[in-house]
UniProtKB/Swiss-Prot annotation:
This is Photosystem II reaction center protein M. PSII is composed of 1 copy each of membrane proteins PsbA, PsbB, PsbC, PsbD, PsbE, PsbF, PsbH, PsbI, PsbJ, PsbK, PsbL, PsbM, PsbT, PsbX, PsbY, PsbZ, Psb30/Ycf12, at least 3 peripheral proteins of the oxygen-evolving complex and a large number of cofactors. It forms dimeric complexes. The gene is psbM. It comes from the Eukaryota. GO terms for biological process: photosynthesis, light reaction. Belongs to the PsbM family. Pfam families: PsbM (PF05151). Keywords: Chloroplast, Membrane, Photosynthesis, Photosystem II, Plastid, Reaction center, Thylakoid, Transmembrane, Transmembrane helix. One of the components of the core complex of photosystem II (PSII). PSII is a light-driven water:plastoquinone oxidoreductase that uses light energy to abstract electrons from H(2)O, generating O(2) and a proton gradient subsequently used for ATP formation. It consists of a core antenna complex that captures photons, and an electron transfer chain that converts photonic excitation into a charge separation. This subunit is found at the monomer-monomer interface. The keyword Transmembrane helix applies. Its main location: plastid. GO terms for cellular component: chloroplast thylakoid membrane; photosystem II.
Length: 34
């Protein structure tokens, strides 16, 4: 179970990091457009 939890956390970070980066770019673009 511990391995599965660590794997899940790794996947979560792998998804959240690029997602947060894209969100920041989107917010900057929206602000520039406005």
């Amino acid at each position: 179970m511990e391995v599965n939890i660590l794997g899940l956390m790794a996947v979560a970070l792998f998804i959240l990091i690029p997602t947060s980066f894209l969100l920041i770019l989107y917010v900057k673009t929206a602000s520039s457009s406005d």
